[in-house]
Amino acid sequence: MFTSEKGVVEEWLSEFKTLPETSLPNYATNLKDKSSLVSSLYKVIQEPQSELLEPVCHQLFEFYRSGEEQLLQFTLQFLPELIWCYLAVSASRNVHSSGCIEALLLGVYNLEIVDKQGHTKVLSFTIPSLSKPSVYHEPSSIGSMALTESALSQHGLSKVVYSGPHPQREMLTAQNRFEVLTFLLLCYNAALTYMPSVSLQSLCQICSRICVCGYPRQHVRKYKGISSRIPVSSGFMVQMLTGIYFAFYNGEWDLAQKALDDIIYRAQLELYPEPLLVANAIKASLPHGPMKSNKEGTRCIQVEITPTSSRISRNAVTSMSIRGHRWKRHGNTELTGQEELMEISEVDEGFYSRAASSTSQSGLSNSSHNCSNKPSIGKNHRRSGGSKTGGKEKETTGESCKDHFARKQTQRAQSENLELLSLKRLTLTTSQSLPKPSSHGLAKTAATVFSKSFEQVSGVTVPHNPSSAVGCGAGTDANRFSACSLQEEKLIYVSERTELPMKHQSGQQRPPSISITLSTD
């Protein structure tokens, strides 16, 4: 230590003793600008045999208990260097030369564990809930927040982490050493934004030295001094990582990178899961290159905020929406029988297009032709009570059949919601699927048409049997378009129909079909 540096420290010691209490705030404001004093104090602390070490430690303790915030921060900036000097002296078993440093650390610890009234202080931290917004994330919108029993039971519940109460210590031993030092690093990390760059550099350097001393990496780092291993605890290493993470984004990239690697190295040797988890998380979140930082501006850790857009579609298909759609559809009495037939044909077209998409267009044209040419095939099978209404409906069937098909096909191509609704109509309950005793012909027809449809898809040629299917012709209806969505058990009847001979008979086969007539009875 040079004479000039020693003179600066001695002047600083004498100045504070003669300082009146009224001028203490101005003195604290001007103290942080004295860079030469700070560097001289670091050199005094690094020399355990210096005669100025004891008065310097006493002066720093007076600063800390003065109650002035800036004087407290001035003392805290030397805390990493003080911890390193204490651990180095303890490892060399030269306890007598570290008495003043130990007294300063104990004094700061005992002041921090109590509040201004002298009561034991309990520090708490509330872990943020993912269901509530924070500076780190925006919860996704899930629609209306229903007050269910589960939601009410969890309302207001959040996990809180407590630190304390901490007992007072009169001396540092091997049992309580890292409990005290971990708490002191916690206090230092709470004031990281007020620490100068020289303090962050000291933090990174002492973290590297503590982790590699006594291990082969010490020769790689070329650290001189003690060569014995310094024991550390898992919580102490986590607190070191907190300060290093801050140093990454505040102008000390290289030193912080070296310290992070050394902490991972030591945590792997000690098999500490907590520092390994935190260190690897920090390493994975770092950018590829150093961050530019304005050392004179506000210090902060950059975080990425998630977008506020909704992540769940408001048109999502749920069991409630399907049930509501089914009720609405069953309660609508304004639909005519032909409109219901168009909807069933549309659903069946979607089913058959998955099996053989190449024949779907021909099936549509054939169904349209059948609807326009034979509007009154199933009239004999209608109930007497609904004959008048059925006659009026069949008079308008031939005119609106093609219009219905064109409108349905256009709507299905333009909107994805129609496809979802079509899939919903394929869902039949057990009660709707079972036929009534009076409708054995309908069940027989449906089974025959299904078997013929799948035989056509698989490419197997089956000789036509007129007696095995109801409503199928003798020569031209082997591949008719099938209508398999039978959803209204009271409105569906089977009517036999004959196929008029086509003028242009082609070799292309058409999908099998059945004729369905609906009644509003």
From Swiss-Prot:
Which superkingdom is the protein from? Eukaryota
Give the chief site where it resides: cytoplasm
Q: Where in the cell is it found?
A: Cytoplasm, Cytosol; Cell membrane
Keywords, comma-separated and alphabetical = Cataract, Cell membrane, Cytoplasm, Disease variant, Leukodystrophy, Membrane, Phosphoprotein
Does this UniProt record's set of keywords contain Amino-acid biosynthesis? no
Q: Where is the composition biased (Low complexity)?
A: 355-373
**Where in this protein does the record put region Disordered?**
355-413, 501-521
Positions carrying Phosphothreonine are 306
* Protein name, per record: Hyccin
